[in-house]
């Protein structure tokens, strides 16, 4: 079992890094904005695989995709995924990874604004350190523009909204992560495919202000091969994520996610040969210091919550067993 978990972690890490690099190549050699087209291709590919799976072993969760909570989750997912690809299109890989790290402190801020859920005071210094480091890197990026920074900010907000909505839907409908994906995928595929031409036409005007990419791949067949490879990698990443979430603690999964961020950051710096100034290095170091600090602080709380939850479940099972015996 342990060897299977390690294999899943390795496969997820390799494919997660590979898909970012492949997507960047697809964007650089498309000649036009294709962020939403890429997202639609991923969803259509995964929906086709899901359709074949449902044909052989139907799932009850698949028939609940028109539930109001499922529709809301699908809309959130349809907004989040194209914007994530658009952010990768308009930013360097390293800058995009720094923007993703901002989701950690921004989640606490947005939860406080909309739900009045204030973070623990002892977590605030680590979150501020993460924000300062990420902003230092973003604002020191010579290739950054107002449009690219704005898209990064929108990506963070939409990712938070997507996570919040999907978590609420999963709680209300009492579904696993895999069942949630089955619910979200049909309508998300429809929404993204229908809106992809419009979104890409708008993003084309924005990306015109960003750096112009020189084509590396000349043959259209080669470009479509990379597009297909991206879809395959996306399917593997999605599947391994669900498997890992079910077999790892939340903290371990967050550590894995941030480890992938560091790997992509290092690779991304050398991807386009863009020079990185000292201030950016300091910003990156500050960001990851804040992340590690946060994870060390949140570890005791995570363990305690898990223990409390386990004790509550045990008490409920014990009470149920006593009731059955008395009857």
Positions of PLM-derived features:
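Polytopic endomembrane small-metabolite transporters, centered on the Drug/Metabolite Transporter
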Residues: 1-327
